[in-house]
């Protein structure tokens, strides 16, 4: 207990501007006041720490009484300074004690034991006469000493002198033990206790110990949540007066700490110290685990948590965990939507002050951070730090799943969403989700039509920066990306990466629905629309929608009548670039490629190759689902729609969908009634050309499709396919309800009506319905027979009828 009093006296009641001859009295006075408040003075201690018995209390009171009588009047001026002097420590408890003491009169501040003795001997008039007048009190409250740098005012000249050291960065008081320097001698005195004493003050809650009682008082507020210091401007409260003082600079705009190198000003000395490491490059804090160095001790402390594998800070809203409390605070603003920091230039708002500061440099053009290696300058220090990794090759952020390393922590965060599947950013217009906020921002340009990037050469505008960069290489002719295998060069790295897959056969993009893999993401994205049925590209003229932008572009030409693709050599124009390319390959219409089997000629060699497979029977393309083989990729793609159920062709009139374009074309003629294909032999007209061709074979007797098993020939290839199933026993069309299989789709469709009870064929005579057309036809024959009988009965004479009914 005595050690506590000693530390309390020596550490917490150093006051400035008190002359040496009054300090003894003042300290004894305060010591007596404290003991008086604690109860009867059963024990006391002096500055040397010697124990004193209770009987010595009266002796000390007597001694203090005499000292006050001798020095009270002469020390009044200094006592007034003592009343108004600034406190030397930032201890909040001492501030309140001293402030309460100063609010009381000098008579009240003399503890009762001394006050009673003085009053008894000399009367109350002695003390009352010693009190300052009202004018003297007003003079005491004045602040006549004003700083030249920042205009701050002080009551005492020594306070101004101490304050000016902040601007000059002068630290004349140096510790002989550690060499640490201070602005004020009082701070040096407090610091020296570190070397001379231990940590006598312990927290009752968590057991933490402190060197100063003021530190313990401040620490206790972390348990109690007490924030007694309130800002008059905005009402924000703080646990420490120093924090309030720093906060108030936000309102006043005061930035008293100036960098000698670049002249930049800061509101806190710690911010200045951190800033100065930009110029010095000093990183004094080193991690013992990995050797990484940091400019701040707080950054090292936060870094240690990474090695410990702990994320102690959890968001109450979404449960996300963080290494640092500052990260949690920043994250929570996402849920609140708060953006308190606004740019005065453009009105843009930010949820962090640092981001606003970085943003302002866009308007000012300031780039204070310079790379020592290449001289490149940056507007933000974080950008410089990341840039320097280009020179060092450092990639400190490593994925635990796949081992991939990154030079940005944000890139690692985005990358990890590939493994977790997390896509937290959602488009409010179309509902599309993204794993990175930047992708959402860029995606929004699809809806807004914004094209903020323009080419300086030709003025062409672009939605995406990558498109602009790629376009600019068209002007320069630059192709910086070269394939190591074949030497082919490319405008951008993406095209090179995609090209390399042609050598490696890599197909990294897999469909989650059906497991199909693709070499290119664009192919996967296009494929996914088969499962989702999504058609995001819509024609504003007719409302027709498409799965691909290129398809919409081709369609739009129908409305404009434009033929944008011109042949420079022959002047021909085409709707599609593919048709122009085809024309370039064969501008004369010549068909130089001839089939040796049947003599048929083709414009392109690929067409001949496909044709020859009919003769050879080669079918290199196999369906993964059912094992069926095909002679071309297009026929395989059409076949796969049977398994996926995709019907991409929709009738705009009735909404009916079709698996093949030819099916839609045939169906469309039902609405128009058009039958443009007419037989020259019999004059019969058809809606579809293929049906006309099949019909004409009836006149010619030609049956080009022959069965290899039995020799039977057919007019149509489809009839041959159906016939061959009689030999193979193949029944590819299976009912999902009962499992029954059929050789023809039409048979399956007819069968499924048994389960659905659908009867689409209705008799016009009696209203009876049937599952199949043949059933209706048979039924209608009955009506035809009844009508014939009725007709005969009506036409025959009555006597014949009567006679025919009489037996002979």
Swiss-Prot record:
The keyword Iron does not apply. May be involved in transcriptional regulation. There is a cross-link at residues 137, 554, 579, 791 (Glycyl lysine isopeptide (Lys-Gly) (interchain with G-Cter in SUMO2)). The keyword tRNA processing does not apply. Pfam families: zf-C2H2 (PF00096), zf-C2H2_6 (PF13912). It comes from Homo sapiens. One of its GO terms (molecular function) is DNA binding. Transmembrane segments: none annotated. This is Zinc finger protein 841. Belongs to the krueppel C2H2-type zinc-finger protein family. Signal peptide: none annotated. One of its GO terms (biological process) is regulation of transcription by RNA polymerase II. It is found in: Nucleus. It comes from the Eukaryota. GO terms for cellular component: nucleus.
């Amino acid at each position: 207990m005595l050690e506590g009093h000693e530390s309390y006296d020596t550490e917490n009641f150093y006051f400035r501007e008190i002359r040496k001859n009054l300090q003894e009295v003042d300290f004894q006075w305060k010591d007596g006041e404290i003991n008086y408040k604690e109860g009867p003075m059963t024990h006391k201690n002096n500055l040397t720490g010697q124990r004193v018995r209770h009987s010595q209390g009266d002796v000390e009171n007597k001694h203090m009484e005499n000292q006050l009588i001798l020095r009270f009047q002469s020390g009044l001026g200094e006592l007034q300074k003592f009343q108004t002097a600034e406190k030397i420590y930032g201890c909040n408890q001492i501030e309140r004690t001293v402030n309460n003491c100063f609010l009381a009169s000098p008579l009240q501040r003399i503890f009762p034991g001394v006050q009673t003795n003085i009053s008894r001997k000399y009367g109350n008039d002695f003390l009352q006469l010693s009190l300052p007048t009202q004018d003297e009190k007003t003079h005491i409250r004045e602040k006549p000493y004003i700083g030249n740098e920042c205009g701050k005012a002080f009551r005492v000249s020594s306070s101004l002198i101490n304050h000016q050291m902040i601007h000059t960065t002068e630290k004349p008081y140096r510790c002989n033990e550690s060499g640490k320097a201070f602005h004020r001698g009082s701070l040096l005195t407090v610091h020296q206790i570190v070397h001379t004493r231990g940590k006598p003050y312990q927290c009752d809650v968590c057991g933490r110990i402190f060197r100063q009682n003021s530190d313990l008082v401040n620490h206790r507020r972390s348990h109690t949540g007490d924030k007694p210091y309130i800002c008059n401007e905005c009402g924000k409260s703080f646990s420490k007066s120093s924090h309030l003082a720093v906060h108030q600079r936000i309102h006043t705009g005061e930035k008293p700490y100036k960098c000698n190198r670049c002249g930049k000003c800061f509101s806190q000395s710690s911010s200045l110290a951190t800033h100065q490491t930009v110029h010095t490059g000093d990183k004094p804090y080193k991690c013992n685990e990995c050797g990484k160095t940091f400019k701040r001790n707080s950054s090292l402390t936060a870094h240690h948590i990474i090695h410990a594998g702990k994320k102690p800070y959890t968001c109450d809203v979404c449960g996300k965990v963080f290494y640092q409390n500052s990260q949690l605070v920043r994250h929570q603003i996402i849920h609140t939507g708060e953006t308190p920091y606004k740019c005065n230039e453009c009105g843009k708002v930010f949820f962090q002050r640092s981001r606003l500061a970085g943003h302002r440099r866009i308007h000012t053009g300031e780039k204070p951070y310079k790379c020592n290696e290449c001289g490149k300058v940056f507007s933000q220090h974080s950008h410089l730090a990341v840039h320097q990794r280009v020179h060092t090759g450092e990639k400190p952020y490593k994925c635990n799943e796949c081992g991939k390393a990154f030079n940005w922590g944000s890139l690692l965060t985005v990358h990890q969403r590939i493994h977790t599947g997390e896509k937290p950013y959602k488009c409010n217009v179309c509902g599309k989700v993204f794993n990175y906020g930047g992708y959402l921002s860029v995606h929004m340009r699809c809806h807004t039509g914004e094209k903020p990037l323009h080419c300086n050469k030709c003025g062409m505008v672009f939605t995406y920066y990558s498109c602009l960069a790629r376009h600019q290489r068209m002007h320069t002719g630059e192709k910086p990306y070269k394939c190591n295998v074949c030497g082919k060069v490319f405008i951008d790295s993406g095209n090179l990466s995609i090209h390399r897959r042609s050598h490696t056969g890599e197909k990294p993009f897999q469909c989650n629905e059906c497991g199909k893999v693709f070499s290119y993401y664009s192919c996967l994205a296009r494929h996914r629309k088969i499962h989702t049925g999504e058609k995001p590209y819509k024609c504003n003229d007719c409302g027709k929608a498409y799965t691909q932008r290129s398809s919409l572009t081709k369609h739009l030409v129908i409305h404009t009548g434009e033929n944008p693709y011109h042949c420079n050599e022959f002047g021909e124009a085409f709707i599609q670039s593919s048709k122009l390319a085809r024309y370039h390959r064969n501008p004369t219409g010549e068909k130089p490629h001839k089939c040796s089997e049947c003599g048929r000629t083709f414009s392109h060699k690929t067409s001949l190759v496909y044709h020859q497979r009919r003769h050879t029977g080669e079918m290199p393309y196999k369906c993964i689902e059912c094992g069926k083989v095909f002679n071309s990729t297009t026929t395989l793609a059409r076949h796969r729609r049977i398994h996926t159920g995709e019907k991409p062709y929709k009738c705009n009139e009735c909404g009916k969908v079709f698996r093949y374009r030819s099916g839609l074309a045939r169906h469309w003629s039902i609405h128009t009634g058009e039958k443009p294909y007419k037989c020259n032999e019999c004059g019969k007209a058809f809606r579809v050309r293929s049906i006309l061709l099949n019909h004409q074979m009836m006149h010619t007797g030609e049956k080009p499709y022959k069965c290899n098993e039995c020799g039977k020939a057919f007019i149509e290839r489809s009839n041959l396919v159906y016939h061959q199933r009689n030999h193979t026993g193949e029944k590819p069309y299976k009912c999902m309800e009962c499992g029954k299989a059929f050789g023809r789709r039409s048979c399956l469709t007819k069968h499924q009506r048994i389960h659905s009870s659908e009867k689409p064929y209705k008799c016009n005579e009696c209203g009876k319905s049937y599952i199949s057309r043949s059933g209706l036809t048979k039924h209608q024959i009955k009506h035809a027979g009844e009508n014939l009988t009725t007709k005969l009965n009506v036409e025959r004479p009555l006597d014949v009828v009567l006679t025919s009914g009489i037996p002979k």
